[in-house]
UniProtKB/Swiss-Prot annotation:
PKD domain mapped to chain residues: 213-247, 436-503, 724-806, 822-886, 925-962
Main location (coarse class): membrane
Localization of this protein: Cell membrane
Entry keyword annotation includes Transmembrane: yes
Membrane topology note: Multi-pass membrane protein
Lineage: Archaea, Methanobacteriati, Methanobacteriota, Methanomada group, Methanococci
Protein name stated in the entry: Uncharacterized protein MJ1468
Keyword Kinase: no
Organism whose genome encodes this protein: Methanocaldococcus jannaschii (strain ATCC 43067 / DSM 2661 / JAL-1 / JCM 10045 / NBRC 100440) (Methanococcus jannaschii)
């Protein structure tokens, strides 16, 4: 068969469809595609979508997440050629195709932080008569990598595609087919930031001769394994379209898409500057191009500007400070030496990896500035998108750290000594733009040269990295180090801490006076973040000589206290009754110092969970998105006071602070029996994905913030098996009786493979098979409804029915004898196409009829040859002859029965009126009264007989009908009272009793022997 020769190369284990101008539905209820006449078509035998037709695409929502995006978000279409829309209000759009081809069409979209992937929406749109078009694929390394040249000749149905290929390709196909085998798309990295180059590759078990990538940003590539640079942040869903060496067209999507993040960092987070103490001194920071970000303060800072980068030469400058000697501490373990003020010039420094480092300048002599007076932070490069891996070790040197910075992968590995943790901590994200002030102490603040000073700190969270800088250019990574200063001077130490939630913590102990230099009082508050009515521990640490001065402490809430500590350290408590930002200010003699406390009544975070798709296929990767969960405290305004307690404004709670940031989440998925099917935890809100078996599930999301607030939500979702789609064609389209008809399944399963097929050919023949091609012959012309039912491995099914016309005419009839010689004839002739318009009956007895269904009566018994001749409106004729036998009616015998009654003594009346004859009448009644008297024959059913003596008599009635057929009936009658309880036994019965008794006797004797 010609069709079979074309189809055989296309029969593979995957799902293949011969294609022609229709929609192949992979994801139902995701889109509506109509041609310019408003027609939506899934029938491959109808070419509804033509080249140059204006086709309308409408996005539909298969679940609630998609509905939210379509209603309130933005949508982007990928038409499967080299065309796609931007993100926008494109719920409905139009597109025109310029040559016949099977195109994968998909839409994607997003709302807030939640995206909807092309992998969840795509279907195939077959444009034009693809099955009957000749395709020439001409690949060359000389062709463009980013576009194709397509030549379409509609006269001879030829498409020539010229495209880039690493090796020359010259292949021809008579038609293309769609193969729903999945193509796996892979990318080279997880964390992608604008400006990053991403490597793509795909995998499929086919020999690919053509591929085209869509990167989702309007650019394309015909390389098999391209590299692409994303220049703008956003959500992108790449797609690859491939054709193999058998002309099978396949598509693959990156399920989760690519989130290209906006770089964030390269700015100054001002804590005490740039203006210090109302303009007494200033701090300035510039990059190597002279740009700043921003030396006017946090209100002007742009955290997305990336002004200060890795390996850039950054200039640090200050002005207006008191003191004779000045120095810089850059926070990364590097300091400048003290320089006399007349020679102090701007300092330059290079940072080697993205990080948020504290930096300070200090002075002493004729006035001094401490680290607590000048603390600010420089956020170097893209800290937001860098992941930090911490590798603590008790074997590492205690005085320095090592690092590895992988710019391409946005990772920093830190290797250092630790005595607080021993296991690595991976994928930590620093919370830039905020820090936590912690208590740091020294057991002595004035010592001799080389005298031991023991330092300690009280981290807010669980520390994973502790770095002490002692102010003399040396460091330690112990939590409570002991240090000796080798020369006299005034030293300003600090401790830098990172906790397991990525919080930056800094503690500044009092200055250390060495070799005759004096230290100064320092005040601390712990905790610096607390709810109302929580006792705040306030500690004064100072040299012994200062403990005898009166200290005036202002709490910022209008209250203050005078204290003469008389010892160091000295601790007392204070409680705040309302929310606010409160400075705790200490004035003692010529020294002053201040700490800030944030008092907030924490509001629990809001847990939000999006699950999509829902319902999902068992082949789908289900996305769980908690990223729209939020902490209502973020950016909430709380009062801010000066140290006198005067309201000076309102402070927006930083989204990166523990007060207003979700610190982590836990997702637990339960099956329908309540068993845990999956559990996942993270300290970062991120979309996670997983596939599940078919079933009903409940997902519970728990989120928590940095203040201990917890909230949860549950969402139900289901995983289903989408049924296969039944479709078939047959050849020839108008077969004749007994001609071989080839049926070809075009069915497909959007999730896998067809398990088996059931064909019902409409003529009583049904077959069950795993073959995609079957053959059948029809014996008679006519209209037959052929039904194909397909099943997948889960026994889900779908059916499609088509009518097949078997051409020709066939005369036939049935008949029924409705009484002795009358016959009803029924015409069962068929013709296709057309209809029968005349009937001629020859009944074989010289009679005829032109009725379609006549009734005829024969005059006598016999065998008759009945012939029916029919004629159609297409001038086809046919005849059929059958033998009709007219038989005499059957004769039924009579039925004998009677009753009797004793009239007087031994006189009995017998009544045979119960006897009857179905097809006639009874002529004679013959009575044998059982007393030896001669039989009595009569035509009267009633007769009287007198017995000579009492006794039991067998009375037999024989009846004879008009056809001389007979029947008999015998009854025992009892005559006389003396025989009521004693019935005489006939002699033959007595003989049988004697014989049986003798037989039993002998059997007993044999048993005894």
């Amino acid at each position: 068969m010609k069709l079979l020769k074309i189809l055989m190369p296309l029969i593979i284990l995957g799902i293949i469809s011969i294609v022609n101008g229709y929609v192949i539905v992979i994801h139902p209820n995701t889109m509506n595609i109509t041609n310019s006449s408003g027609v939506y078509n899934t029938d491959p035998n109808i070419i509804a979508y033509n080249v140059n037709d204006t086709i309308t695409f409408e996005a539909l929502a298969p679940d609630s997440v998609a509905q939210d995006i379509l209603d309130n978000g933005v949508v982007k279409w990928d038409f499967g050629d080299l065309t796609e829309t931007d993100y926008g209000n494109y719920r409905t759009t139009t597109h025109t195709y310029t040559f016949p081809f099977p195109y994968p069409v998909a839409w994607c979209g997003y709302l807030n932080n939640t995206g909807y992937s092309k992998a969840l929406t795509y279907n195939w749109l077959v444009v034009g008569d693809v099955a009957n078009t000749k395709y020439v694929f001409n690949g060359s390394p000389l062709n463009s990598k980013t576009s194709w040249e397509v030549y379409y000749n509609s006269t001879n149905n030829t498409v020539i595609i010229k495209y880039y290929s690493e090796t020359p390709v010259d292949r021809e196909f008579n038609g293309l087919s769609v193969d729903t085998t999945s193509v796996t798309v892979n990318v080279s990295r997880d964390e992608i930031v604008e400006g990053d180059t991403v490597k793509f590759n795909f995998s499929v078990s086919r020999n690919i001769i053509f591929c085209v990538w869509s990167f989702g940003d309007g650019t394309f590539s015909f390389e098999k394994f391209p590299e692409h640079t994303y220049t703008k942040s956003g959500l992108y869903y790449p797609r690859v379209l491939v054709v193999d060496d058998s002309g099978r067209v396949m598509v693959g999507y990156l399920d989760e898409g690519i989130e290209v993040k906006r770089a964030r960092g390269g700015y100054i987070y001002w804590v005490t500057g740039p203006s210090h103490y109302d303009g007494e001194a200033y701090t300035y920071v510039y990059n190597s191009s002279g740009d700043d970000n921003n030396n006017n303060g946090n209100a002007y800072t742009d955290p997305y500007k990336i002004t200060y980068k890795v390996n850039d030469t950054i200039k640090f400058e200050m002005s207006g400070a008191w003191g004779e000697y000045w120095k810089w501490d850059f926070g990364d373990g590097t300091e400048t030496p003290y320089t006399y003020k007349s020679y102090f010039t701007p300092s330059y420094h290079q940072y080697k990896f993205p990080f948020m480092w504290p930096f300070f300048w200090m002075s002493y002599g004729w006035g001094s500035w401490w680290k607590s007076d000048t603390l600010n932070f420089i956020v170097v490069d893209d800290v937001e998108n860098t992941r930090y891996n911490f590798y603590p070790s008790s074997a590492h040197d205690k005085t320095y750290y090592d690092y590895e910075y992988n710019k391409e992968n946005h990772t920093v590995n830190l290797y250092y000594y630790s005595d607080v943790i021993s296991t690595p901590k991976f994928n930590v994200k620093l919370r830039d733009g905020y820090y936590i002030d912690i208590t740091a102490t020294a057991d002595k603040t004035q010592v001799s040269v080389n005298e031991n000073v023991r330092f300690d700190c009280s981290p807010y969270g669980n520390p994973i990295f502790i770095m002490w800088c002692f102010g003399d250019g040396t460091c330690s990574f112990e939590k409570s180090p002991t240090h000796r200063y080798s020369s006299s001077g005034l030293y300003y130490p600090h401790v830098f801490v990172i906790d397991d939630n990525g919080n930056i913590e800094v503690g500044i102990p009092p200055p250390i006076g060495v070799g005759g230099y004096s230290s100064y009082p320092q005040i601390y508050a712990s905790p610096t973040i607390a709810p109302t009515y929580y006792p705040i521990n306030i500690t004064i640490v100072e040299p012994a000589s200062w403990t005898w001065y009166w200290h005036h402490i202002y709490f910022g809430d209008g209250g203050s206290v005078w204290i003469k500590p008389k010892k160091s350290p000295y601790t007392f408590t204070h409680t705040y009754t309302s929310e606010g930002v409160y400075p705790i200010y200490m004035k003692v003699y010529t020294a002053e110092n201040m700490k800030t406390v944030y008092v907030i009544d924490n509001k629990n975070p809001i847990a939000k969970l999006y699950i999509y798709p829902n319902p999902a296929s068992y082949k789908d990767t289900i996305s769980f998105s908690p990223i729209n969960s939020y902490d209502p405290d973020a950016n909430r305004m709380i009062p801010e006071y000066n140290y006198y307690g005067t309201l000076i404004g309102y402070y927006p709670i930083s989204p990166n602070s523990p007060m207003a940031r979700i610190y982590g989440f836990n997702l637990t998925v339960y099956d329908s029996n309540g068993n845990v099917a999956w559990n996942y935890s993270s300290n970062e809100l991120t979309i996670i994905s997983k596939s599940f078996p078919i079933g009903n599930y409940t997902a519970k999301l728990v989120v928590w913030d940095g203040m201990g607030g917890v909230n949860s939500t549950t969402v139900k979702f289901s995983v289903i098996n989408r049924p296969p789609v039944a479709q078939f064609i047959y050849y020839p389209d108008k077969p004749e009786p007994n001609e071989d008809v080839e049926f070809v399944s075009q069915s497909y399963d959007p999730e896998g493979e067809i398990a088996y097929y059931i064909w019902n050919f409409g003529d009583g023949t049904v077959i069950n098979t795993t073959d995609t091609i079957v053959h059948h012959k029809y014996e008679r012309p006519g209209y037959y409804t052929v039904t194909l039912t397909v099943f997948d491995k889960y026994n889900a099914s779908s059916s499609i029915s088509k009518q097949i016309v078997v051409g020709g005419i066939l005369a036939n009839f049935t008949y029924e004898i409705i009484n002795e010689n009358t016959v009803r004839f029924e015409d069962t002739s068929v013709v296709a196409p057309g209809k029968i318009i005349s009937w001629h009956w020859d009944f074989g007895d010289g009679s005829t009829s032109t009725e379609q269904n006549p009734i005829h009566t024969y005059s006598k018994e016999g065998a008759y040859f009945v012939t029916l001749t029919v004629k159609s409106d297409t001038n086809l004729t046919d005849s059929v002859t059958k033998i009709v036998i007219i038989s005499p009616p059957p004769k039924y015998p009579p039925v004998a029965d009677f009753t009797y009654k004793v009239i007087n003594g031994t006189t009995v009346e017998f009544n045979a009126n119960l006897s009857y004859d179905e097809d006639g009448y009874i002529k004679y009644y013959i009575w044998d009264f059982g007393d030896g008297t001669p039989a009595n024959t009569t035509t009267n059913p009633i007769i009287i007989h007198k017995y000579k003596k009492e006794g039991v008599y067998p009375v037999t009635l024989t009846v004879i009908d008009n056809d001389n057929l007979s029947d008999s009936r015998t009854k025992l009658i009892n005559i006389g009272e003396s025989f009521i309880h004693s019935v005489p036994i006939p002699p033959y019965i007595e003989i049988l009793i004697v014989i049986s008794t003798i037989f039993c006797f002998f059997q007993i004797i044999r048993g005894l022997k």
